[in-house]
Amino acid sequence: MIHPKKLLHIDSVTLKSQLEDGKIRVIIVDGIKQEAWITEAPEHGKTLVETRKGDLARVEFEIGYKLN
C-alpha cells in the first residue's frame, strides 16, 4: 500500500489520466483547500477517510484476506 499522494495541477488533471489497469484508486477532493489526493484501495478491505475540523487528517486501510 502506498501513502496518499497530492495531485498537482488539479485544474488540468483528468480522471482518465488516473486510470491504471488492474488498480482501484480512491481520489479525495478537498473543496476547502482546493486540493486533491489519490491512493490505491486495498485488494480486499475498507478505506476510511478521516477528517479533523474540516481538514483531511488521514486515510486508514482495513485489509482482509479472502479465505477459500
Swiss-Prot record:
A Pfam cross-reference name: PBSX_XtrA
Protein family: To B.subtilis YqaO.
Protein name (record): Phage-like element PBSX protein XtrA
Classification of source organism: Bacteria, Bacillati, Bacillota, Bacilli, Bacillales
Gene: xtrA
